[in-house]
C-alpha cells in the first residue's frame, strides 16, 4: 500500500497514511532537504514596533501615524541603538550618557546564543570583545521577547505575564514610585528571581554575566522610552516633513533626558526600626517578645485603619480578595479597562490583541497569609513595598507624616511602617493561615 509515515507526537509512534504516492514521498523528502540546506542561516532578529503606543498616540493626537513616519522612527532608533545582533549606545559626556551602560556588556548579552563563554577573570582580546555570548536570548528572550516588551513566545501562557521593560517601569525596587530602579535593584531581581512567578533565579551566573544582563535590560528600557517620544514627534509631522534626527534632538534631548532620570535615582532612606522584627526561631527575651507582640497589634490596627487602608485591597482576612477588578499599568497602556463600557469591551479587546497585546487580566492583591513575597522576603523589602508602593500596580505609596508632626496630622510614621512589616510577617504563622496544622494540634472531641 502506498503510504507516508506521519509522526504522532502524543504517542511517539509512526502511523501509516495512505494519502500520498511514493513519488509524492520522494518529492516531499527532496523539498525538505532543499529547505534544510538553503535555510542554514537563521533570519535576522529585529526590534518590533510598539503598535500599542502608536495607536495610543493616534488617539491622543487625532492623526494617523503612517508607515512613512514609522520608518523614520525606526531609522532613528537604529542610529541610536543599533540592532538586536549589533547593539550600540551613544556615550556622550555632554548628554550625560557616557556611563549609563558599558558597551562591552551590551555586546556580551546581545546576539544569538554562541556557546562561547568568557572567563570573567581573564583580559578579553579584541576578537573576544567583538563576540557576543547571546546571554539575553539564552536566558530571557523566551519570556521577555527580543524587544524586551514582555511578549516572548511563552509569555501568553504565563501568569503573571513577563515584565515589559520598554515602559521603563519596574515593580520591585528601592526607589519611590515614578523613578527608575537602581542597577542593584535589577541585579537583585536576577539573582533571587521573583517568587511565585515564572521568573527564576540566575544566582549561578558569573558576576560578569549578571552585569551584562543588567546593562542590556537598561538598554532595552531606554530604547523603548525613546521610541515612545519619537512616535509622538512623528505624529506631529506635516505631510512630507522629516523627523529631526540631529544630535541635539536624538542624543541631547531624547536620550539624555531619559538617561538623566536613571542616573539621579537613589534608594529611599530606611529608618532604623525601634522594635524587634518578627522572625521565627529567634531567641527573644521576655521583654523583647512583649515589645514584638505590641508592634504586631499596632500593625494590625494600622492595617484596618483609614490611613494605611491595607484591607481595602488585601481583604479583611488578608487573603488578597479586597478587590479583583483593577489592572496593572502595562495592561492599561491603551485603555483604562475598568472604565470601558461593557458593550465596548469585546471590540476594544479585539483591537488590543490585534496590536500584539496580551489578553487583559486583572491584577490581584497579594495573599499575605501565604508568606510568598515577590519583591523579596527581607524586612527591608517589605518596608520598601509599604513605603514606596509598587510601580505599575495599584499598590500606593504610604502617606508619611512630616517629621515632628503631631497626632492631628494624617499620615504614617516610619515606626508605623515597621509595625505593619511585623504584622505582615506574622500572618503566615497565624492559626487562620494553617487550618490543617491547627486541626491536628487541637483535635476536636467527637461524641
Task: Give names to the regions the model predicted.
Residues 53-80, 156-205, 210-217, 242-265, ...:
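Extracytoplasmic electron-transfer domains, predominantly the class I c-type cytochrome c fold
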Residues 22-31:
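Sec-dependent N-terminal signal peptides
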Residues 37-39:
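C-terminal motif of bacterial Sec signal peptides marking the signal peptidase cleavage site
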Residues 41-44:
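Bacterial signal peptide processing site
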Residues 58-135, 249-306, 319-320, 409-412, ...:
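Electrostatic cytochrome c docking/interface patches
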Residues 136-142, 147, 198, 209, ...:
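Short pre-active-site segment immediately N-terminal to redox-active cysteine/selenocysteine motifs
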Residues 125-145, 291-316, 323-338, 420:
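Sequence/structural segment immediately N-terminal to covalent heme-attachment motifs in c-type
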Residues 1-22:
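N-terminal secretory signal peptides that target proteins for export/translocation
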Amino acid at each position: 500500500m502506498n503510504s507516508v509515515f506521519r509522526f504522532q507526537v502524543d504517542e511517539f509512534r509512526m502511523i501509516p497514511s495512505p494519502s500520498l504516492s511514493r513519488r509524492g514521498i520522494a518529492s516531499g523528502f527532496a523539498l525538505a532537504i532543499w529547505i534544510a540546506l538553503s535555510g542554514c542561516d537563521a533570519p535576522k532578529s529585529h526590534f518590533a514596533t510598539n503598535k500599542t503606543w502608536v495607536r495610543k498616540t493616534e488617539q491622543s493626537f487625532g492623526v494617523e501615524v503612517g508607515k512613512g513616519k514609522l520608518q523614520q522612527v525606526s531609522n532613528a532608533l537604529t542610529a541610536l541603538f543599533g540592532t538586536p545582533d549589533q547593539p550600540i549606545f551613544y556615550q556622550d559626556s555632554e548628554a550625560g550618557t557616557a556611563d549609563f551602560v558599558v558597551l562591552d556588556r551590551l555586546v556580551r548579552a546581545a546576539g544569538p546564543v554562541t556557546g562561547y563563554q568568557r572567563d570573567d577573570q581573564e583580559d578579553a582580546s579584541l576578537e573576544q570583545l567583538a563576540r557576543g555570548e547571546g546571554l539575553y536570548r539564552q536566558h530571557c528572550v523566551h519570556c521577555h521577547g527580543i524587544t524586551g516588551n514582555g511578549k516572548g513566545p511563552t509569555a501568553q501562557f504565563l501568569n503573571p505575564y513577563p515584565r515589559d521593560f520598554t515602559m521603563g517601569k519596574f515593580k520591585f525596587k528601592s526607589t519611590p514610585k515614578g523613578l527608575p530602579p537602581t542597577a542593584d535593584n535589577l541585579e537583585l531581581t536576577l539573582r533571587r528571581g521573583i517568587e511565585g512567578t515564572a521568573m527564576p533565579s540566575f544566582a549561578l551566573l558569573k558576576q560578569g554575566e549578571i552585569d551584562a544582563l543588567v546593562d542590556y535590560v537598561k538598554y532595552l528600557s531606554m530604547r523603548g522610552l525613546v521610541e515612545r517620544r519619537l512616535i509622538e514627534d512623528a505624529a506631529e509631522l506635516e505631510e512630507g516633513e522629516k523627523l529631526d534626527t540631529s544630535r541635539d534632538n536624538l542624543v541631547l534631548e531624547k536620550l539624555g533626558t531619559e538617561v538623566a532620570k536613571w542616573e539621579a535615582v537613589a534608594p529611599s532612606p530606611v529608618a532604623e526600626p525601634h522594635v524587634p522584627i518578627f522572625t521565627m526561631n529567634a531567641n527573644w527575651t521576655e521583654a523583647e517578645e512583649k515589645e514584638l507582640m505590641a508592634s504586631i497589634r499596632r500593625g494590625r490596627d494600622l492595617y484596618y485603619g483609614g490611613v494605611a487602608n491595607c484591607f481595602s485591597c488585601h481583604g479583611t482576612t488578608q487573603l488578597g480578595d479586597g478587590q479583583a477588578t483593577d489592572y496593572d499599568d502595562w495592561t492599561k497602556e491603551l485603555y483604562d479597562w475598568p472604565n470601558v463600557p461593557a458593550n465596548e469591551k469585546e471590540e476594544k479587546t479585539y483591537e488590543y490583541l490585534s496590536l500584539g497585546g496580551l489578553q487583559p487580566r486583572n491584577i490581584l492583591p497579594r495573599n499575605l497569609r501565604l508568606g510568598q513575597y515577590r519583591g523579596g522576603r527581607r524586612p527591608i523589602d517589605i518596608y520598601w513595598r509599604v513605603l514606596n508602593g509598587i510601580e505599575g500596580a495599584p499598590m500606593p505609596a504610604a502617606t508619611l507624616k512630616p517629621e515632628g508632626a503631631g497626632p492631628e496630622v494624617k499620615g504614617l510614621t516610619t515606626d508605623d511602617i515597621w509595625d505593619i512589616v511585623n504584622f505582615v510577617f506574622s500572618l503566615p504563622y497565624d492559626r487562620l493561615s494553617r487550618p490543617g496544622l491547627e486541626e491536628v494540634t487541637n483535635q476536636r472531641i467527637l461524641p
